[in-house]
Amino acid sequence: MISDIIKELEEKMTKSISALKKELTSMKAGRANPAMLDRIEVDYYGTMTPLNQLANISVPESRVLMIQPWDKSAMKSIEKAILISDLGLNPSNDGTTMRLVIPELTEETRKNIVKNVKKAGEDGKVALRAIRRDANDKVKSLKKDNSITEDEMKSAENDIQKKTDSYVKEIDKMVEAKEKEIMSI
């Protein structure tokens, strides 16, 4: 019973960490990274489709992303999706390929990105706390039903807290690494 609760807790926390990792990867850091475009969806024949399913995205130079759509008729839609995204990138389109030059980050831009990184990290921690609360509630309900003893409940809550602390440390490390990456370019 308790082991199932802890296993579920770990699965949910791992998913939460993965989501944060993906979000941090998509935040631009002055270097070209295909993951920056992961959240861009293109209106492709009336259906919102992820950009990475419509085109090959490569990094020919450290600050350039090259997009080669498999269907050249989607070029205008891709360009429009990039322009309306919050990335602030201006695509140059030659009809068959599209190039995105990642601008140098100003000090102000870096600070704004770091602020967003910290906010994403804090949101990740809030999600972990909610998962911890759910797990603790399940343990308490087991105690209420007299399925476990008081000592087992305290032990389980202690285990849950230790797991939560380790995942929070992981978030702190991820946020710190991303901040360092942004500020060192």
Swiss-Prot record:
Report whether Hydrolase shows up as a keyword of the record. no
Any one GO molecular function term: ribosomal large subunit binding
Location of the protein in the cell:
Cytoplasm
Provide the coiled-coil residue spans.
none
Could you tell me the Gene Ontology terms of the biological process aspect for this record? Answer: translational termination
Q: Cross-referenced Gene3D superfamilies, in alphabetical order?
A: 3.30.1360.40, Ribosome-recycling factor (1.10.132.20)
Keyword terms, alphabetized: Cytoplasm, Protein biosynthesis
One GO CC term on file: cytoplasm
Q: A Pfam family matched by this chain, by name? A: RRF
- InterPro entries given for it? Ribosome_recyc_fac, Ribosome_recyc_fac_dom, RRF_sf
Asked whether the keyword Nucleus is assigned, the reply is no
Q: Which family does it belong to?
A: Belongs to the RRF family.
Describe the task this protein carries out.
Responsible for the release of ribosomes from messenger RNA at the termination of protein biosynthesis. May increase the efficiency of translation by recycling ribosomes from one round of translation to another.
What name is this protein filed under?
Answer: Ribosome-recycling factor
